[in-house]
Amino acid sequence: MQRRPLIETVHGIRREAFGPQEWGLLASIAAMWGASFLFIEIGLEHFGPGLVAFGRVGIGAITLALLPRSHAPVDRADLPRIALLGFVWMAAPLLLFPIGQQWIDSSLAGMINGAVPVFAAVIAAILLRRRPGRRQLLGIAIGFVGVICVFWPATRGAEATVLGAGLVLLAVVFYGLAVNLAVPLQQRYGALPVLFRAQLVALVLLAPAALVSLPSSEFAWSSALAVMALGFFGTGWAFVAMTTLVGRVGATRGSVAIYFLPVVAIALGVVFRDETVASISLIGTGLVLAGAYLTSRRE
């Protein structure tokens, strides 16, 4: 039997324009992940970054464990790929976000997250050896300009702000790789078995970070409830919806769901945290929405 490479990706099964199911998945992803940045900020009020990351993955794994399909068998030959996903999709980015958000607002973190489709498209082109179509390239370019506008105010701030924004951007790079690697696995087994096992791997990897965070953490219901919501929605149901969307439309177009996160993140940050957003960041948000529309059209 021919051995599959450790790193592989494929196209989605749906090549035409988004339909009602795809847009519904996209909206739910944007709502759940857009709120995640607010939940992280609330969690950081009393918990260290490692504990926030470990807690959200733990709750997410418990959520998926309750679904029978999560326990469906997978080929042992694919376990190394799932373990790799546990690092690049779960452990690394989910730890980098709370570390970075110690120095930046939740709305800024959400807006930077809009860069995922840019990296997803570049990595997909490399792995698939296929360049995106003209419409997708235009959408990616417009979205990339929008992300630069969103990121620009952070470059004018203190060094800690730049560091925090940079760590969040690094997490986004991991996401760009992960959405590509997840496609063949989720098409082979479905979303739940892959996600559940990847989260179990991430729990092991994040355990040392959680232990390091314990001395600087104290229990508070506000932070505990935020982490619970973060795990149930942001690490449970949102990942299921995302892998379902990516499996249907491919990594490049599926990742456009990330374009809509800034809208939710900005609204929640302004309403609940009294955060301020620079005008250029709002312009950038409009650009990434335009890029999302173009990228989601027929290839």
Regions picked out by a protein language model, each given a short descriptive name:
Residues 2-54, 99, 157-184:
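Glycine-/small-residue-enriched transmembrane alpha-helix faces in small-molecule transporters
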Residues 7, 58, 64, 123, ...:
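Hydrophobic transmembrane alpha-helices of multi-pass small-molecule transport proteins
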Residues 18-23, 45-50, 54, 74-80, ...:
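Juxtamembrane helix-entry segments on the extracytoplasmic side of multipass membrane proteins
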Residues 31-40, 65-113, 149, 231-249:
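Specific transmembrane alpha-helical segments of multi-pass solute transporters/efflux pumps
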Residues 34, 38, 65, 86-91, ...:
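Hydrophobic/small/kink-forming positions within alpha-helical transmembrane segments
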Residues 51-62, 89, 94-131, 135-136, ...:
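Specific alpha-helical transmembrane segments that line the substrate/conduction pathway
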Residues 54-55, 90, 109-115, 179-204, ...:
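Helix-helix packing/entry segments at the starts of transmembrane helices
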Residues 61-64, 120-122, 126, 140, ...:
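Transmembrane alpha-helical segments that form core, pore/gating elements
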